[in-house]
């Protein structure tokens, strides 16, 4: 996800948090999209409509916030081992960064936020951003509950994974199908809106 920090997010965050409070949730409620869909953890006692209302609020935030994103996907069954996966992802990310060089070179600093969830991903990002090493700062002390953009990125990745599964001829999981209510609803209310935020 890319965000120019000169573009203020405070109004978008306030609207999101007001809307969560209107649902009876804590204003600072951290939205975890996977558990929300699967009805796990803090969402275990919520019905589908209650959970969908939460995701609707996050979708509204994503639509209105001054952000864009790029998702890198690959099919592991066509790659032999971790090294091949690493190399394919690295190539895709570096190609994207080179394509976006004119935009990225306008900035004096690039901040890269990652929560250290997977050390191999952190290392992959360090390698990819080596071409901007002199102005890239890695911020790894990232806690999802403190960063709405991190939660938005989680939502986008979850939806893109569902889209990738469908495009690859796989089926949605039972919990995904029950939550989204069919492919028409998924396309109309989720895939189409996030597609407008794809980095061109």
List where the protein language model places each region:
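Phosphate-ester processing/binding pockets and catalytic centers
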Residues: 1-200
């Amino acid at each position: 996800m890319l965000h120019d920090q000169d573009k203020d997010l405070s109004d978008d965050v306030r609207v999101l948090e007001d809307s969560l409070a209107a649902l009876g949730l804590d204003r600072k409620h951290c939205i975890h999209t996977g558990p929300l869909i699967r009805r796990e953890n803090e969402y275990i006692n919520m019905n589908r409509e209650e959970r969908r209302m939460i995701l609707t609020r996050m979708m509204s935030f994503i639509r209105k916030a001054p952000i864009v994103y790029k998702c890198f996907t690959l099919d592991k069954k066509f790659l032999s081992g971790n090294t091949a996966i690493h190399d394919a992802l690295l190539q895709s990310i570096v190609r994207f960064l080179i394509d976006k060089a004119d935009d990225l070179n306008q900035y004096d600093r690039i901040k890269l936020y990652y929560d250290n969830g997977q050390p191999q991903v952190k290392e992959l990002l360090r390698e990819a951003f080596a071409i901007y090493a002199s102005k890239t700062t890695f911020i790894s002390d990232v806690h999802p509950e403190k960063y709405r953009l991190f939660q938005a990125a989680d939502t986008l990745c979850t939806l893109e994974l569902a889209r990738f599964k469908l495009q690859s001829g796989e089926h949605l999981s039972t919990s995904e199908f029950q939550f989204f209510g069919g492919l028409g609803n998924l396309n109309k209310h989720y895939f189409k809106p996030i597609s407008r935020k794809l980095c061109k």
